[in-house]
């Protein structure tokens, strides 16, 4: 069963591909999406990643939550 994760405080330079590659180190990523402003198309600083299974999602949260990337500590947790 897949598990969806919220990813907050991501660098504004991140796009879908960078987000996916960041999480692929911890399991199979089904989808990765950086949320963007409808008008400007610029990153809003958060996104969502869907991992193939719960154990991969758990490993990703454990490894990446509060990890510093480009001077920002990202937030990773399971969506509710």
PLM regions and their residue ranges:
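Canonical RRM/RBD RNA-binding surface and closely related RRM-like beta-sheet modules
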Residues: 1-78
């Amino acid at each position: 069963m897949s598990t969806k994760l919220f990813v907050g405080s991501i660098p504004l330079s991140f796009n879908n591909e960078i987000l996916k590659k960041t999480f692929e180190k911890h399991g199979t990523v089904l989808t990765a999406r950086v949320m963007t402003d409808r008008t400007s198309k610029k990153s809003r600083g958060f996104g969502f990643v869907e991992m193939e299974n719960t154990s991969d999602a758990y490993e990703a949260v454990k490894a990446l939550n509060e990890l510093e990337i480009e001077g920002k500590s990202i937030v990773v947790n399971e969506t509710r």
